[in-house]
Amino acid sequence: MKQIIFTDLDGTLLDSVTYSYEKSLAGINRLKQNDIPIIFCSAKTRAEQELYRRKMKVFHPFIVENGGAILLPSNYFPFSFGYRRIVDELLVIELGIPYNEVKKLVDKIKEEGGFHFRGFGDMSAEEVAKESGLDIESAKLAKQREYSETV
């Protein structure tokens, strides 16, 4: 029987305070040795997940922005399937709507509902870093939203 692991990143493979994955490496390496695919499924953006995929050397499909899209390496499966576009040699199956549409809707809800909040799209990378505890480079990656808005 083929096994596969779907996992979140924040607080699972990544320490929820330091964002370190050091404590997860032994398990990740054991899964790799046993040819068990590790599928990241996270609220993180494609840009954020690509950084961790490179660092951890995990090159399986991954799910971004809480299901906004599934990205697969172009030659991952030996069969064809429907996908919307190709980005950096990744096939993109889009399940969500584009960020600009999400942002318009969030802004409309905010305005018409009289709500007072800011999303990542309303903040600079410096503000995102300050509010989230991310370092500035991570905040820049977190702002590269394609399917969701963090408020």
Question: Which stretches of residues belong to each language-model region?
Answer:
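Asp-based phosphoryl-transfer active-site loop
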Residues: 2-18
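Conserved acidic, metal-coordinating active-site core of Asp-based
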Residues: 109-151
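Residue-level signal for pocket-adjacent positions within structured domains
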Residues: 8-9, 65, 146
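Gly/Ser/Thr-rich helix-start
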Residues: 12, 65-69, 134
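Short hydrophobic/aromatic-rich motifs at helix boundaries and adjacent loops
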Residues: 1, 18-23, 96-100, 132-138
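Active-site phosphate-binding/coordination module
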Residues: 22-119
